[in-house]
């Protein structure tokens, strides 16, 4: 959205969750009471799941195009600490990231972008050229970019039901298992 706004487009960001500050309060409420807001929590809301993660910024090790550098420089321009530009494992804490996300949103709005929070895409109507929001409101659009993360199963189901072509993203899961050396030796050497 930020790049589109910089290029003169007026992106409309439709977010099923809350704005980042409201989301922070919703997450704190969950941690204190155990009461979950299904659309504003550690997974859903402005900033995505990474906002409430351990703060590590995953870097593109083989990024010969310099995209990662651009992202880090953009974060710094919106208030992230400069050391993320040279640290081997850059890190931004949640409190700082909330300020960065909010500053980016404000800049996108200054450039003509628009944000709709608590607005879930519940249907896509390609023939009409519109999205359905919260099962009621229709928004006309010429192009749609979905950045829904992996937890929006209801949205994936809607896309599947609509016949949208999708493919699973490959991923790997690592497991570390420790065994006594004697057991390893016995299994290896008899």
Describe every region a protein language model picked out.
Residues 1-190:
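Residues forming the flavin
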């Amino acid at each position: 959205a930020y790049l589109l706004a910089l290029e003169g487009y007026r992106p409309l960001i439709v977010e099923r969750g809350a704005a980042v500050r409201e989301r922070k309060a919703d997450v704190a409420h969950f941690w204190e009471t155990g009461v979950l807001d299904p659309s504003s929590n550690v997974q859903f809301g402005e900033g995505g799941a990474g906002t409430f993660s351990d703060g590590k910024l995953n870097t593109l090790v083989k990024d010969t195009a310099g995209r990662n550098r651009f992202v880090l420089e953009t974060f710094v321009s919106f208030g992230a600490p400069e050391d993320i530009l040279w640290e081997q494992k850059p890190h931004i804490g949640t409190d700082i990231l909330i300020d960065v996300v909010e500053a980016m949103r404000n800049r996108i709005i200054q450039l003509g972008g628009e944000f709709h929070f608590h607005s879930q895409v519940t249907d896509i109507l390609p023939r009409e050229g519109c999205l359905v929001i919260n099962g009621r409101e229709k928004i006309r659009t010429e192009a749609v970019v979905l950045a829904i993360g992996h937890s929006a199963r209801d949205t994936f189901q809607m896309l599947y039901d609509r016949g949208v072509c999708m493919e699973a993203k490959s991923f790997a899961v690592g497991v570390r298992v420790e065994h006594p050396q004697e057991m390893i030796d016995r299994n290896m050497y008899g």
